[in-house]
């Protein structure tokens, strides 16, 4: 392959492989809850405490008296890595959270469970919102949108990459 894509940058082991990263887009990581959940904003500190297992009930963040069902991504996920770096900031994830392997799974579980919370790429919320009953909550009172990600205002965002090895072929450059 001439080009590889990734939702994360190179880790320490990969930096010695001679790969050149090319930023192709900026992506927001949307925090999603069930449409019926009245909570519409969470701070990064509240998110950290939810994913660390310190906040366990929605009433602690202005919602109903309902247990929070924490949905996490698997360790191979670039989305999880970005969320861990930006939101968790060195705080470990609670080992009791459900770990799912894909965006669709996270979205489906959150749409079926009134108390669930998850995180997915912003593009999947907007493109599939009509067929699922999830909503993206604001983070630090900033709405998750293409505009706020592009402006740098939305706090949970990352770069998306293409990687090439050495000098890219003409086909790769045209792509």
Predicted regions and their residues:
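Exported/periplasmic ABC-transporter solute-binding proteins
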Residues: 1-175
């Amino acid at each position: 392959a001439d080009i590889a894509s990734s939702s994360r940058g190179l880790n320490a082991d990969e930096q010695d492989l001679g790969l050149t990263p090319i930023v192709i887009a900026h992506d927001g990581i949307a925090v999603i809850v069930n449409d019926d959940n009245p909570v519409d904003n969470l701070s990064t500190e509240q998110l950290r405490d939810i994913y660390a297992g310190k906040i366990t009930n929605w009433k602690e963040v202005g919602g109903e008296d309902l247990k929070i069902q924490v949905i996490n991504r698997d360790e191979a996920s670039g989305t999880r890595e970005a969320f861990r770096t930006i939101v968790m900031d060195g705080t470990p994830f609670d080992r009791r959270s459900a770990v799912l392997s894909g965006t669709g799974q996270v979205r489906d579980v959150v749409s079926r469970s009134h108390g669930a919370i998850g995180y997915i790429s912003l593009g999947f919320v907007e493109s599939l919102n009509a067929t699922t009953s999830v909503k993206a909550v604001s983070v630090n009172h900033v709405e998750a949108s293409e505009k706020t990600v592009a402006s740098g205002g939305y706090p949970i965002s990352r770069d998306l990459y293409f990687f090439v090895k050495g000098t890219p072929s003409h086909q790769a450059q045209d792509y």
